[in-house]
Amino acid sequence: MTGAPIVSARGVTRRFGGLVALDGVDLDVPSGIVQAIIGPNGSGKTTLLNALSGASHADAGSIRIGGAEIFRLKPHRIARLGLSRTFQNIRIFGDLSVLENVKVAAACHVRSSLFDIVVAGARQQATESDIEERARQALDLVGLAHRADDRARELAYAQQRLLEIARALASEPKVMLLDEPAAGMNTAESMTLLETIGKLKARGITILFVEHNVRLVMGISDRIAVLDFGKKIAEGTPSEVQRNPLVIEAYLGRRHRHA
């Protein structure tokens, strides 16, 4: 593994009552790569994303983004350090236009001082122009520029997922977390998503994603970490992970035991 880690987690633990959802997980993600997190249902994948993004704090451990400790920071402060994320459930404003959805996301990450608020004028216009430009660039990258003026609820399901990625991109992140981005997509739609992730990587954005579509994971990932029962049981390149006996047991052994 080359490159300094832009995301570094050590001993991340999360409990829900008597259930240990994450059990001392370590993870290093080098800058600029596509890193997948896979594992059987209930293995702790989304819980780890929640801990990294601040959506749900871990009980113990250390998490760093670009060298800055973010353990127990609020999500908006983590976002300002350059991390954005999407969720399993689509979170868009259906009655707003596609462009307005992305502009709202971009505006949430614009810092304004009291002086900026009081003395608006040209500075405010410049900010609004910048937000619009960033929003349109994000839509262009995900292939939704032609739907900018349509209501978000009019988009097909897969396009709404791409809109979520555009909203996350509008904050100009260094790291993007994607939670099951291909859920509910057919093969053609998944290929479009794969191309979009490739474009994000080409822009230097580090991608960390959870996904059940193994073919997509193997096709786009530089590295894969595998969780099972809250523990990291394997990590490596796609070919290394595919051959790992612990991974084979986690996916196939459990299936045979419950058949």
Pin down the residues of each PLM region.
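Glycine-rich phosphate-binding loops of nucleotide-dependent enzymes
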Residues: 2-259
